[in-house]
Regions:
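Alpha-helical metal-binding/catalytic segments enriched in His/Glu/Asp
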Residues: 133-135, 149-210, 330
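Metal-dependent peptidase/peptidase-like ectodomains
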Residues: 142, 194, 204-298, 302-307, ...
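His/Asp/Glu-rich mid-to-C-terminal helical/loop segments that flank catalytic regions of hydrolases
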Residues: 191, 306-352
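Second-shell loop/turn segments in exported
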Residues: 40-48, 64-74, 119-124, 163-175, ...
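Acidic/His- and Gly-rich active-site-bordering loop/insert found
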Residues: 61, 87, 123-161
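N-terminal hydrophobic or amphipathic helices/low-complexity stretches enriched
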Residues: 29-94, 137-138, 143, 347
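A non-catalytic alpha/beta surface segment that caps or lines the substrate-entry region
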Residues: 69-137
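Bacterial N-terminal signal peptides
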Residues: 11-25
């Protein structure tokens, strides 16, 4: 009988085959039938369906066949295509270039010295462009108000071997878990009654080497930046943090705004970041948005585990009950926000 590893590998290869024709022509990925007023056709996932989708998406994104989704590599592009295909299947509207779900981003040439230094010991491949995958669920009563849900697609790719000889930095927790969360939330909201506000789902490329995807989103956003009511970035939620209750998540910059406390009032299991000395608020894609004045925070449960940025950040280390519960716990609070008239605000001296 085939091994579980072989079955996972086969599923990835089949998925790559299924989207290979789309990779040749990104326009064919999204077609021209979707519009900003597209009507999602899916139903919201049950708990069993959510668990199944979370397992499937994580297995794809963190598989060795994606070689760690290195920033600005073919494998990151495959991850972006995978997300774009999911968005299209859900009946969401495209938020990328020219009516597609992909935003193509040219990297500077030559790359800045800090980036060259960061990738010096990783796979030697041309890194000239990255990709964002973006989808839109248009609101009803106040479509001009936007809730932005984000994560990053990439990890480190192929690099120095660890003690076991593993050279693939799979990035299961960082940040396949966050990408999976955004895809699951997209499915949940696409299958529910349309919210009052618009929801934008954005998966950024090349966060690990300097936030190039995020910067391109800010430079050419699918909606006016001033229309964004709030941003939640999902980063490393695949394992529980012993510093907080097992069913909880933490929010970076919790005291900077009234956003976290209000989400908690509406059912989110959110606490203040228990690792303030790590400056996580400034270390994720939310920070660039916050510097534009957007209320933007990162949701996480990163425990400072030793697998961070190592080949050992593998699918086998993921706490799936925690991950699925974490995603499910955010559905109602985000749905409340998407249907509310309330707007979060910075606390005194909270805006960076």
């Amino acid at each position: 009988m085939p091994t579980a590893s072989l079955l996972r590998r086969s599923s990835v290869l089949l998925a790559l085959f299924a989207i290979s024709s789309l990779a040749v022509n990104p326009v064919s990925l999204v077609g021209q039938s979707s519009s900003f007023d597209a009507h999602p056709s899916q139903t919201a996932p049950t708990s069993v369906a959510l668990d199944r989708e979370v397992h499937a998406d994580m297995a794809f994104l963190a598989d060795d066949d994606l070689h760690g989704r290195g920033s600005a590599t073919r494998d990151e592009h495959i991850a972006a295509l995978f997300a774009a295909a999911r968005f299209q299947t859900l009946g969401l509207a495209p938020g990328g270039d020219k009516g597609t779900f992909l935003q193509k981003v040219a990297l500077p040439s030559p790359l800045p010295p800090r980036v060259q230094q960061r990738i010096a010991h990783f796979e030697d491949t041309p890194r000239t462009q990255t990709w964002n995958a973006i989808a839109i669920l248009r609101g009803t009563a106040s479509p001009e108000e936007v809730v932005l849900l984000t994560a990053h697609l990439d990890h480190l790719g192929v690099g120095p071997a660890n003690a076991t000889g593993d050279t693939i930095y799979n990035g299961a927790d960082d940040d396949a878990s966050g990408t999976t969360a955004v895809l699951a939330l997209a499915q949940a909201f696409a299958g529910s009654p349309r919210p009052r506000r618009t929801i934008v789902f954005a998966l950024f490329g090349s966060e690990e080497i300097g936030g190039f995807g995020n910067a391109a989103f800010l430079a050419s956003p699918p909606v006016p930046l001033a229309s964004i009511v709030a941003n939640l970035e999902f980063e490393m939620i695949g394992r529980a943090d012993p510093a907080i209750p097992a069913d909880a998540l933490w929010l970076t910059g919790f005291d900077r705004s009234n956003f976290g406390p209000e989400l908690a009032k509406h059912g989110a299991h959110l606490l203040a970041d228990p690792h303030p000395s790590e400056n996580f608020f400034q270390r994720s894609d939310n920070y660039a948005l916050a510097r534009q004045g957007i209320i933007a925070h990162t949701v996480s449960s990163f425990s400072l585990h030793k697998d961070y940025h190592q080949p050992s950040d593998e699918l086998s280390r993921i706490d799936f009950p925690h991950l699925t519960s974490a995603i499910a716990s955010m559905i109602d609070p985000i749905q409340w926000l998407a249907n509310a008239t309330w707007r979060p605000a910075w606390n005194p001296n909270g805006r960076p």
